[in-house]
Amino acid sequence: MTKQRQDAWSEENDLLLAETVLRHVREGSTQLNAFEEVGDKLNRTSAACGFRWNAVVRHQYEKALQLAKKQRKQRMRALGNGQPAKKRLLYQPPAVDPEIIQETAAEEPVKTETPSVENEQPLMSGEHMPFVDESFKEELASLSHLLSPQTPAAAPEMTMNDVIRFLQNYEGNHEQSSALKMENERLKKENQELQNKTEQLEAEVQKLEKDQKTIQEDYETLVKIMNRARKLVLFEEDEHASPSFKMDRNGNLEKLAE
């Protein structure tokens, strides 16, 4: 079946692409295999599906993709007893009828030698690729359809809606970054003002404590002076007090003891 280029992607197509990629990643397959399955279902090339995933759909399912990778690692560890397991492809593209290939070859006036699909391994085969970081392996698998010589070169599908969405996201991110920068500057200024006010209040508290100490010392000194004055007054009153006399039976005056 010849796959025709289609510019319009619907929400159902994006949802199918996301669900298929997440399922392949979660069950230990590759994103490239998921692109092939979606391409056959939607009559699109795997290159178009890969470009749509990386350019538009992926950023909407980033958390789900990370969760799927985590579940895949746990599943592989459980099946392989802690050893890294090889990926298995969940989807096998339908075989091409040999008669169609012969008819196509007969119509072409000149046929150049190309590597056989059966005899040549894919550029980034999940089974023969050396063990590297899983996320890096996924990125290589998603780009292998663009680098493989056996895949027909297909122009990336970019619609006007994709361009507008990208520019809107870019402008929104730029405005958000500017707003965050302004908010950061405002918070820094407010923090500096609060620090200055705190230092001012601390200085006032120290001054009040010093004044209170001075007042306390003056009060104690005043109390001491008042006590001394009171004692002095009592002493003078005792000195000036007139003596008391008492007359006995014989008519003599006797000074009373104080």
UniProtKB/Swiss-Prot annotation:
UniProt subcellular location: Forespore
Keywords, alphabetical: Activator, Coiled coil, DNA-binding, Repressor, Sporulation, Transcription, Transcription regulation
Start-end of Basic and acidic residues biased regions: 246-258
Keyword Coiled coil appears in the UniProt entry: yes
UniProt cross-references to PROSITE patterns, sorted A to Z: MYB_LIKE
UniProt domain Myb-like: residue ranges: 1-57
Biological process per Gene Ontology, one example term: sporulation resulting in formation of a cellular spore
GO CC annotations, alphabetized: intracellular immature spore
Segments for region (Disordered): 238-258
Protein family membership: Belongs to the RsfA transcriptional regulator family.
Primary role: Seems to improve the efficiency of sporulation by fine-tuning the expression of genes in the sigma F regulon, particularly the timing of their expression. Negatively regulates spoIIR and its own synthesis.
Protein name: Prespore-specific transcriptional regulator RsfA
Organism: Bacillus subtilis (strain 168)
Source lineage: Bacteria, Bacillati, Bacillota, Bacilli, Bacillales
